C-alpha cells in the first residue's frame, strides 16, 4: 500500500489561510509543476458555495486547473466519471454527511475510480467527511437526529477515523471506538494525517493541531502521532 498519497484533514479554516501549510503539502505530493485538481463536494450534498475558496487556494499554489464535479447532478456515466477522476493529479473531497458521501460514491462508481486513482499514485485529500472516506471506517454525526455512527469507507487507510477531535462532542469517539475491531485515528481541527512513500506523518496548519492514535493493541491508549509511532 505505497502507491497513492493521502492527506486526511481533521478540520480548520481555509478562507483565512490557517491551513495553507497543509495545502502546500498536498500540492507538493503531486510532484507536478502545475497539477490538475478535481473537487468532490459530495458529502455536502453537492452544494458548491465554498468551492471558490478551494479554487483560490490551489490557484495560488500553482495548480493549472480546478474543476468541481457534483456527482449527483452532473449526469455522468460511470466511465465518464472514472475518466474525470483519473485525469486529475489531486482529488479533494469536502466535508458534510459521510453516509451520504459513501452511498453516492458506491452507487456512481466513484468509489472504484478513487481506489484506482490511489493505485495510480494520485493525491487523495479532504477534510472531515472528505478525510474519513479514505479510512476503513469513519465516525460521523450523520445518524438519526445528528447521532454519531460508524460508516464503512474506502479502506485505503487501516483505521477508524474521527475529525474535529478537539470538540467535546466528537470525543465520544473515545468510548465508541472500543467496540471496533481496529485502532482509531482522531484528528483535531488544524491537523492532518499524511500517507506518502510508504510512511505516515502528521502535518498541521498555522495554529497547530494534533493527530491522536487510539491503539487497540494497548487497550485504546491515546498517544499523539509523530513520524515514528505509525511507521514501526
Which residue stretches match the model-derived regions?
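Portal/gating segments that form or line small-molecule/metal binding sites
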Residues: 38-39, 44-96, 100
